[in-house]
């Protein structure tokens, strides 16, 4: 019998949804972590440093405008025809959400303070997809954490949310798992908030752009197999039931050997542990004493996450420009700028990034020596 991951893969393939090899492992892992976290909050069987561990894996996808951010989240979470839409996993999908809308607030009604908890309360046991969460994005793109709302941070960390306002105190517990996204930006992953998300960085190569065009066309008129949808339903029901049997969770030495080999910073290890935990839960039989082990598949998933986090740490926008130059060595500057318009970047933004990359010695620039009046510049990646 196929496991949950294999069945979800088949569900996506039947519906002609592209690049599932890149994205599906992370979202399935996060979904399994969500279920096991709810169970751990009920029975408290897995502890870290004397506290019941929070096992949620929040996800954040960064991609240019029009390149699958909303599409991916909707196919997992939105309405009954999504992957998890009719399963034991509670899901919701929202468009634009403010910080107050997520955390909540207190308002004065007829002279009395009335609590108005936000989505973190309303969907406390859901996986919530948010198309545009400006407060979250603004916090992670800030050079410092001074603008960080502590209530937002704790909602995604321990789940114990306390927000003190002039009208009173807002206090509740949430176990919501958040999946969000934005356009490429300079994210500060060393901040408390950035460390709590697994990142997917998707700036399609020229080949992938052609594949996207093909996937879009192939998906016309495709409903997908009801039998596969039923299998996803039954497997999530079984997983939720089997999770109730778990009495302890341990991590094999191979997990830490793998993390040491990748030189993962200690403050990012919990993220990689959760990826491995979720993937093991989705692919292995559930036992009362469940051991998380390293596999070739997990090594590949970890490597993807490591590469994406490096690109984001070093500048997601710079990485986007570099990708085009690496694909087309010697590309003329104005040709590059024109291409990047379709990726949400203005001529001025691209010019500034080219100058930055040149100063960092990541690219070389050759001026057109044949026509001095043309002022053409050709860009090359530095080895």
Go through the PLM ranges and name each one.
Residues 72-99, 310-342:
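Long, charge-rich low-complexity segments
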Residues 21-38, 274-281, 359:
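Short, hydrophobic/amphipathic alpha-helical patches that form generic packing surfaces
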Residues 3, 17-21, 67, 71, ...:
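Charged, alpha-helix-enriched surfaces in structured cytosolic catalytic cores
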Residues 1-7, 48-49, 244-255:
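Active-site-adjacent bridging/hinge elements
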Residues 314-383:
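Terminal-proximal interaction/regulatory segments of ATP-powered molecular machines
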Residues 142, 163-176, 181-319:
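Phosphate-sensing "switch" segment of ASCE/P-loop ATPases
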Residues 1-28:
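Charged, amphipathic alpha-helical linker segments immediately N-terminal to NTP-binding catalytic cores
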Residues 30-207, 358, 364-369:
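Conserved ASCE/P-loop NTPase catalytic core
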């Amino acid at each position: 019998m196929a496991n949950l991951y294999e069945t979800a893969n088949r569900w996506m393939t039947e519906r002609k949804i592209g690049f599932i090899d890149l994205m599906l492992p992370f979202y399935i892992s996060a979904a399994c972590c969500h279920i096991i976290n709810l169970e751990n909050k009920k029975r408290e069987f897995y502890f870290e440093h004397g506290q019941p561990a929070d096992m949620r894996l929040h996800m954040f996808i960064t991609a240019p405008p029009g390149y699958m951010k909303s599409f991916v989240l909707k196919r997992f979470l939105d309405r009954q025809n999504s992957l998890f839409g009719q399963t034991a996993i509670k899901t919701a999908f929202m468009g634009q959400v403010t910080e107050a809308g997520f955390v909540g607030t207190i308002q004065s009604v007829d002279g009395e303070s009335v609590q108005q908890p936000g989505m973190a309360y309303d969907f406390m046991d859901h996986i919530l997809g948010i198309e545009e969460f400006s407060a979250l994005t603004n916090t992670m793109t800030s050079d410092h954490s001074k603008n960080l709302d502590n209530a937002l941070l704790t909602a995604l960390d321990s789940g114990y949310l306390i927000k003190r306002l002039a009208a009173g105190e807002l206090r509740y517990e949430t176990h919501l798992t958040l999946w969000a996204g934005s356009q490429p930006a300079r994210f500060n992953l060393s901040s408390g908030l950035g460390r709590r998300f697994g990142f997917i960085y998707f700036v399609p190569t020229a080949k992938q752009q052609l594949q996207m065009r093909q996937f879009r066309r192939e998906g016309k008129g495709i409903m997908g197999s009801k039998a596969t949808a039923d299998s996803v339903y039954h497997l999530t029901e079984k997983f939720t039931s089997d999770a109730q049997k778990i009495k302890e969770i341990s991590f094999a030495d191979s997990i830490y050997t793998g993390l040491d080999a990748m030189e993962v910073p200690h403050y990012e290890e919990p993220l990689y542990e959760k990826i491995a935990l979720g993937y093991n839960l989705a692919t292995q039989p559930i036992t009362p004493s469940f051991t998380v082990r390293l596999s070739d598949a997990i090594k590949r998933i970890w490597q993807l996450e490591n590469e994406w986090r490096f690109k984001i740490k070093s500048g997601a926008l710079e990485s986007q420009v570099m990708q085009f130059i690496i694909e087309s060595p010697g590309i003329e500057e104005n040709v590059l700028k024109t291409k990047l318009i379709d990726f949400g970047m203005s001529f001025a933004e691209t010019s500034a990034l080219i100058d930055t990359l040149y100063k960092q010695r990541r690219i070389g620039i050759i001026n057109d020596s044949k026509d001095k009046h043309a002022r053409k510049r050709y860009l090359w990646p530095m080895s």
